[in-house]
């Protein structure tokens, strides 16, 4: 049964969260106003709720949550929250309230990041020690996107002394240096690299085939405060991933490299923020199959200027950005058939204006209105105009909690699609235009939250519904590349969709023991106006049910954490028959996304031992176990060919069933 094993683990965590009392620690804040005494618990959880579905996470507080493989990754942390789907180890996306990964914007200091996660799902491109705060919202308000928004920001304070944050383990090593350069300037430098295959080469496999993988990234930022009203921030990031595997069954070999590069400069003066930025994502995939092969490069580049202003109840802003996208195209090799063309290059210009107003209607009732207008000049030099109004109504029920309703519309001019079943991130970006019309959405979110026992506990619930227009899915396969018959328009399914669901969370946010239990039930449905695809189908990433439990205990000289995730399997399209044509196996597929992978279940454990812990420095060891129950979670289905030339279609698991690790960390 899907929930039998996780329910046992969840029951233990729930009992701990609800009934264990933290002793020997001051966990209350008391304010005296004349003869009135106001008392509230001191929040020790890294997670804080805000208005309109906005949640803020202090990155420094992530040290109190389970650190897997010596790393408390902020994006992996998000997947344990209600409404954010847990992806497989080969899914590099972030799905918020049923939306596609490309529907949500993930950014670094406000600059879009087009590939936010490293492979295996354990690490993102964000080195935690380099950032101060993560802001997460269920809807994108700073960009033309249909989904949510995640932004990691840099610290703006000037350190009073040299700061170091170093960690090395069996999987990776990372470090951050923060150094003051005078009284008003600070430099931050971070680097990270993996050596997964050094010790785990025989454990990390895709099925029975070895998967070679590694990544590295670097951050450099400079903060300057020339006056009390001015802050200058310069930021640079570069990262690279490389992966390779060869299938013994099919003689299929894939060698891929991908990475992000971005830079930005911003100036904040009083309530005005101005920024220039550039961001790029490049993907190169080489495929070899028997005597055939193909090189498939793609990528996207963008650069822009943004200005925003806040003053009292008003805020406003403007942004313009240029795009250059290289679409996926196979350059054939090893066969006589030459590639009939070359990769398509798209260029476009996107501009936006927005404004918002906050108002207090009554002592218990407040509202905010927001209007965003956009213009997109597509690659064919056709203009597309969009107007996205939205509004939020908040009702303070005093001791009964807070109720909030948000509704609005959204536009989007970027797409991401491609092959998802090769074991490598082979999806590419393209721009609205001749291949697909701009996307749009109408959404509504009803939220409730309340705190209990002077802030010791918090509960939160969301009901959401979102319509999606102008959706695409990629239906092609690998052999379209090899035969020289590749045609992007022929491989795209076009239609509409809708997401709806309910998510709830119980959060213990004070005391030595903190954590939460979250549950989400929802649908992510798509329909395509294509013969043979009548009706509604679940999206490729849909999880009908998902349960998450996270618990952390901070003791004296040690800390421990555990997390449990249990979720329904994601859909896939299975073949109902095979036949052999020459040396090629031809599959006849059944109904689109009518099958599902087995349910996903994983338990992670973490323990920190602080050898030295004082006001100046911390030295410790981290012991962690990824997938402690050794559950084998399939990541996709594939065609197997036996030595007797028999065919079978079965699940493919990522080779490691359990991944223990030890790391040493030092903070100054």
How should these model regions be labeled?
Residues 49-126, 132-140, 155:
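Periplasmic N-terminal accessory/gating domains of Gram-negative outer-membrane beta-barrel systems
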Residues 566-582, 602, 609-668:
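C-terminal beta-signal and adjacent terminal beta-strands/loops
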Residues 302-308, 342-354, 454-518, 546, ...:
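Outer membrane beta-barrel strand-and-loop segments of large Gram-negative receptors
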Residues 363, 465-467, 490-576:
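Gram-negative outer-membrane beta-barrel transporters
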Residues 196, 211, 231-304, 337-346, ...:
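Flexible loop and strand-edge segments within Gram-negative outer membrane beta-barrel domains
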Residues 315-321, 342-468, 518-520, 546, ...:
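Structural signature of Gram-negative outer-membrane beta-barrels, strongest in the C-terminal barrel
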Residues 331-333, 395, 399-444, 465-489, ...:
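Surface-exposed extracellular loop regions of Gram-negative outer-membrane beta-barrel proteins
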Residues 169-193, 207-242, 255-275, 307, ...:
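Transmembrane beta-barrel wall of Gram-negative outer-membrane proteins
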């Amino acid at each position: 049964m899907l929930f039998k094993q996780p329910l046992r683990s969840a029951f233990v965590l729930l009992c701990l969260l609800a009934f264990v009392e933290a002793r020997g620690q001051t966990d209350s804040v008391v304010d005296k106003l004349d003869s009135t005494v106001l008392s509230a618990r001191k929040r020790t959880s890294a997670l804080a709720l805000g208005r309109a579905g906005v949640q803020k996470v202090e990155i420094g507080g992530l040290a109190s949550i389970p650190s897997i493989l010596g790393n408390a990754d902020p994006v992996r942390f998000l997947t344990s929250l209600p409404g954010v789907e847990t992806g497989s180890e080969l899914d590099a996306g972030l799905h918020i309230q049923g939306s596609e990964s490309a529907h949500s914007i993930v950014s670094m200091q406000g600059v879009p990041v087009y590939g936010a996660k490293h492979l295996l799902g354990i690490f993102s491109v964000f080195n935690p020690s380099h950032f101060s705060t993560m802001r997460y919202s269920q809807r994108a308000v700073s960009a033309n996107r249909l989904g949510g928004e995640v932004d990691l920001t840099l610290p703006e304070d000037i350190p009073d002394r040299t700061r170091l944050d170093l960690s090395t383990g069996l999987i990776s090593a990372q470090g951050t240096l923060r150094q003051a350069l005078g009284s008003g300037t600070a430099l931050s430098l971070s680097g990270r690299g993996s050596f997964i295959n050094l010790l785990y080469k025989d454990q990390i496999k895709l099925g029975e085939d070895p998967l070679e993988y590694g990544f590295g990234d670097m951050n450099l930022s400079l903060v300057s405060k020339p006056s009390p009203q001015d802050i200058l921030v310069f930021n640079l990031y570069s990262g690279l991933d490389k992966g390779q595997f060869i299938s013994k069954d099919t003689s299929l070999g894939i060698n891929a490299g991908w990475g992000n590069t971005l830079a930005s400069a911003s100036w904040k003066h009083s309530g005005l923020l101005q920024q220039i930025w550039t961001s790029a994502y490049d993907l190169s995939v080489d495929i070899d199959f028997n005597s055939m092969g193909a090189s498939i490069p793609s990528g996207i580049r963008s650069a822009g200027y943004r200005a925003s202003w806040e003053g009292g109840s008003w805020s406003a802003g403007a942004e313009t950005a240029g795009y250059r996208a290289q679409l996926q195209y196979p350059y054939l090799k090893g066969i006589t058939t030459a590639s009939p063309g070359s990769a398509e290059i798209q260029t476009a210009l996107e501009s936006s204006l927005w404004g918002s107003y906050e108002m207090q209607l009554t002592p218990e009732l407040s509202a905010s209105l927001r209007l965003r207008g956009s213009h997109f000049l597509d690659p064919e030099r056709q203009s597309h105009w969009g107007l996205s109004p939205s509004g939020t109504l908040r009702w303070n029920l005093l001791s009964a909690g807070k109720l909030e309703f948000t509704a609005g519309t959204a536009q989007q001019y970027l797409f991401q699609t491609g092959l998802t079943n090769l074991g490598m991130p082979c999806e590419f970006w393209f721009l609205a235009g001749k291949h697909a019309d701009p996307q749009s959405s109408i959404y509504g979110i009803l939220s409730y939250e309340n705190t209990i026992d002077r802030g010791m506990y918090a509960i939160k619930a969301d009901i959401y519904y979102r319509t999606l227009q102008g959706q695409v899915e990629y239906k092609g396969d690998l052999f379209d590349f090899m035969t020289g018959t590749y045609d992007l328009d022929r491989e795209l399914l076009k239609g509409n969709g809708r997401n709806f669901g309910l998510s709830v969370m119980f959060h213990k946010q004070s005391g030595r023991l903190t954590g939460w239990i979250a549950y989400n039930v929802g649908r992510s449905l798509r329909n395509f106006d294509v013969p043979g695809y009548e009706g509604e189908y679940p999206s490729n990433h849909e999880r009908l049910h998902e349960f998450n439990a996270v618990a952390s205990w901070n003791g004296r000289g040690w800390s421990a954490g555990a997390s449990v995730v249990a979720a329904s399997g994601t859909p896939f399209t299975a073949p109902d028959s095979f036949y052999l044509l020459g040396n090629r196996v031809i599959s006849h597929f059944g109904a689109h996304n009518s099958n599902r992978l087995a349910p996903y279940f994983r338990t992670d454990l973490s323990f920190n031992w602080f050898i030295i812990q004082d006001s100046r420095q911390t030295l410790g060891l981290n012991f962690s176990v990824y997938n402690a129950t050794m559950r084998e979670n399939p990541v996709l289905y594939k065609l197997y060919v036996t030595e007797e030339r028999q065919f079978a279609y079965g699940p493919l698991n990522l080779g490691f069933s359990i991944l223990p690790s030890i790391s040493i960390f030092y903070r100054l």
